[in-house]
Design a protein with these regions (language model features):
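Short, glycine-rich nucleotide/cofactor-binding loops
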Residues: 26-41, 73
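Histidine-anchored nucleotide/phosphate-binding helix
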Residues: 40-53, 59
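Short internal beta-strands
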Residues: 57-62, 99-103
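N-terminal beta-loop-helix "entrance" segment that forms/cooperates
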Residues: 65-79
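Short, flexible loop segments at the rims of nucleotide/cofactor-binding pockets, characterized by
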Residues: 75-80, 116-120
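Short, Lys/Arg-enriched N-terminal segments with co-localized hydrophobic residues
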Residues: 4-22
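A glycine-rich helix N-cap at a beta->alpha junction
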Residues: 76-103
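C-terminal structural segments of small proteins and small subunits
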Residues: 109-131, 135, 140
Length: 142
């Protein structure tokens, strides 16, 4: 039996008592980097919204998006209508979200373990992205 719960988006985020007891798994795959700040920030905003709704959220950064894990980028980048990267990142990190950062893309762009230090993040290879996608209930790509 499948039960669908609907929350009217015009009423703001669902309160804790309105959330379904089942927590879904959400994967947000971001490939847009500092060259596309609105799209990059939108990916993190959607991940944050998923966390606010009570879902388990994983974010996989690949391609140019690996640069988003750097503090200088987090602190300086905002999207048009999608907010500050730092605010969304901090909310995700504080809420138990986890970041996977493409090891191959990182190597090509000079992102190192030092850039991940103190963050809920780890370097990952493409097979991890495939595993996350098959484990997720829903996947969004930005």
């Amino acid at each position: 039996m499948t039960v669908f719960l609907h929350h009217h988006p015009g009423l703001g985020p669902a309160t804790k008592s309105e959330r379904p007891t089942f927590m879904g798994k959400l994967l947000v795959h971001i490939t847009s980097g500092p060259e596309a700040p609105t799209r990059a920030a939108l990916g993190l905003l959607v991940a944050r919204a998923g966390m606010d709704e009570g879902h388990e959220v994983s974010i996989f950064l690949a391609g140019d998006a690996v640069q988003l894990i750097r503090d200088a980028v987090l602190d300086s980048l905002s999207g048009l209508g999608t907010g500050s990267l730092r605010e969304s990142f901090d909310a995700i990190a504080g809420g138990g979200g986890h970041f996977y950062v493409s090891g191959m893309s990182s190597k090509a762009r000079g992102v190192t373990e030092d850039d991940l230090a103190g963050k809920p993040a780890e370097l990952a290879m493409p097979n991890r992205l495939v595993q996350l996608a098959f484990d997720a209930d829903r996947t969004f790509t930005y």
